[in-house]
């Protein structure tokens, strides 16, 4: 009898993808056979980058990660997270935690997701020490104000951010 394939999703807005996100993706890939990184539309957050741009940035970053034998795919999604997870055949949703403030939000979301489908487990991974303070919001703010963001995002993401900030400054 063949063992059941371990399938999970790791959802996020990824506006932009950071080294913290990539740390979670890499670590999650060690625990499953197939990991789908779901890039959420999330128009309510008013993303800096379009959905297509965010998907492409995540794909380029993930292509450079060690997969630990797992298959990692990157796809956009616009529906409920639980519906997305089920459509992917996932039995797990990975979420990263940086601080207590993350936990409060994630705890509530986990409870709601469990009510929607108790067969899909939420697995929390603590941010590594080197990435526990990184957030997309802070990266954008630091970059917009001229700070060095190279240690927080992959080089291709840094370049896209700097180009976008330059475009915004020219049109202002």
Swiss-Prot record:
Q: Name one GO cellular component term.
A: cytoplasm
Give the domain of life: Bacteria
The site annotation (Transition state stabilizer) covers 21
| The protein's name | Phosphopantetheine adenylyltransferase
Spell out the subunit comment: Homohexamer.
> To which pathway does this protein belong?
Cofactor biosynthesis; coenzyme A biosynthesis; CoA from (R)-pantothenate: step 4/5
A GO BP term, please? coenzyme A biosynthetic process
The record's EC number reads 2.7.7.3
Against InterPro entries, the record matches this protein to:
Cyt_trans-like, PPAT, Rossmann-like_a/b/a_fold
Give the EC class as a word. Answer: transferase
Q: Which family does it belong to?
A: Belongs to the bacterial CoaD family.
Q: Where does substrate bind?
A: 13, 45, 81, 95
Swiss-Prot/TrEMBL catalytic activity: (R)-4'-phosphopantetheine + ATP + H(+) = 3'-dephospho-CoA + diphosphate
The entry's keywords: ATP-binding, Coenzyme A biosynthesis, Cytoplasm, Magnesium, Nucleotide-binding, Nucleotidyltransferase, Transferase
* Cofactor section: Mg(2+)
Keyword Cytoplasm tagged: yes
Q: Check the UniProt entry and state the signal peptide residues, or none.
A: none
* One MF term in the entry's GO annotations: ATP binding
SUPFAM superfamilies in the cross-refs: Nucleotidylyl transferase
**Gene3D superfamilies from the xrefs?**
HUPs
Q: Which Pfam families match?
A: CTP_transf_like
Question: Binding residues for ATP, per the UniProt record?
Answer: 13-14, 21, 96-98, 106, 131-137
Function recorded in the entry = Reversibly transfers an adenylyl group from ATP to 4'-phosphopantetheine, yielding dephospho-CoA (dPCoA) and pyrophosphate.
Location relative to the cell: Cytoplasm
């Amino acid at each position: 009898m063949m063992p059941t394939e371990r399938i999970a999703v790791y959802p996020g807005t990824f506006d932009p993808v950071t080294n913290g996100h990539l740390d979670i993706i890499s670590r999650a890939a060690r625990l499953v056979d197939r990991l789908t990184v779901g890039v959420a539309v999330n128009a309510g957050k008013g993303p800096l980058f379009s959905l297509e741009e965010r998907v492409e940035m995540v794909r380029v970053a993930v292509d450079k990660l060690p997969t630990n034998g797992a298959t990692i795919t990157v796809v956009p999604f616009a529906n409920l997270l639980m519906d997305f997870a089920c459509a992917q055949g996932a039995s797990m949703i990975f979420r990263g935690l940086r601080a207590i403030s993350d936990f409060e939000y994630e705890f509530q979301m986990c409870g709601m997701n469990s009510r929607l489908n108790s067969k899909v487990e939420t697995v929390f991974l603590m941010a590594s020490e080197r990435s526990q303070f990184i957030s997309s919001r802070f990266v954008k703010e630091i970059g917009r104000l001229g700070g060095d963001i190279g240690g927080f995002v992959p080089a291709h993401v840094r370049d896209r951010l700097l180009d976008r900030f330059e475009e915004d400054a020219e049109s202002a």
